[in-house]
């Protein structure tokens, strides 16, 4: 699901209401953002950890929501928290032996798909996984989650121009990895 400006405004309004102690607004805020957070952390880390990382993201967000002041959209604020959760997780995982290898693409699709569609998904997922972390993060934030370049820059803590160049490099890398036959259909 790609976020629209009206979606972001509604989610931000829910977060502001939750910051004032409205439990129903907090519940609605979590429901409205849970899928985006899960997909973001699944791509940045691995599917096996996505549920735990999503939960940790929301635990941190709930603790910090009384201080949320809407300087950015609530979605941007939440994805920045998710990014920090993933970074903490990666630091922890690097300190011990790794037992799993990346995301399993079959967990990233909904329902039954045709075999070719599944093969395409596996190929694209593998190509995205081969991007640098910075490129993958910028591409996912702007192209999958639909954040503006400015919001993606806020999540990543870097200038907008850096996000633009990371997305451009990611697209170039994906096109270079694609086989010529795939480009012509």
From Swiss-Prot:
Entry keyword set: DNA-binding, Sigma factor, Transcription, Transcription regulation
Region (Sigma-70 factor domain-2), start-end ranges: 30-94
Motif Polymerase core binding location, chain numbering: 52-55
GO molecular function: DNA binding; sigma factor activity
Gene Ontology BP, a term: regulation of DNA-templated transcription
The organism's place on the tree of life at top rank: Bacteria
Coiled-coil blocks: none
Other remarks in the entry: Was identified as a high-confidence drug target.
Domain notes: The sigma-70 factor domain-2 mediates sequence-specific interaction with the -10 element in promoter DNA, and plays an important role in melting the double-stranded DNA and the formation of the transcription bubble. The sigma-70 factor domain-2 mediates interaction with the RNA polymerase subunits RpoB and RpoC.
Protein name as it appears in the record: ECF RNA polymerase sigma factor SigC
Organism in which the protein naturally occurs: Mycobacterium tuberculosis (strain ATCC 25618 / H37Rv)
Lineage of source species: Bacteria, Bacillati, Actinomycetota, Actinomycetes, Mycobacteriales
């Amino acid at each position: 699901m790609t976020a629209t400006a009206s979606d972001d405004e509604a989610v931000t309004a829910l977060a502001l209401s939750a910051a004032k102690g409205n439990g129903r607004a907090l519940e609605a805020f979590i429901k409205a953002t849970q899928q985006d957070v899960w997909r973001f952390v699944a791509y940045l880390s691995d599917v096996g950890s996505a549920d735990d990382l999503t939960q940790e993201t929301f635990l941190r967000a709930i603790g910090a929501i009384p201080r949320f002041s809407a300087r950015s959209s609530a979605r941007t604020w939440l994805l920045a928290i998710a990014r920090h959760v993933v970074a903490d997780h990666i630091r922890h995982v690097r300190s011990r032996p790794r037992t799993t290898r990346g995301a399993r693409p079959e967990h990233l699709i909904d329902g039954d798909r045709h075999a070719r569609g599944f093969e395409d998904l596996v190929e694209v997922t593998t190509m995205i996984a081969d991007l640098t972390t910075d490129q993958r993060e910028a591409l996912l934030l702007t192209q999958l989650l639909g954040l503006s370049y400015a919001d993606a820059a806020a999540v990543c803590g870097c200038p907008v121009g850096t996000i633009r160049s990371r997305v451009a490099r990611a697209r170039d890398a994906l096109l270079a990895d694609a086989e010529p036959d795939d480009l012509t259909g």
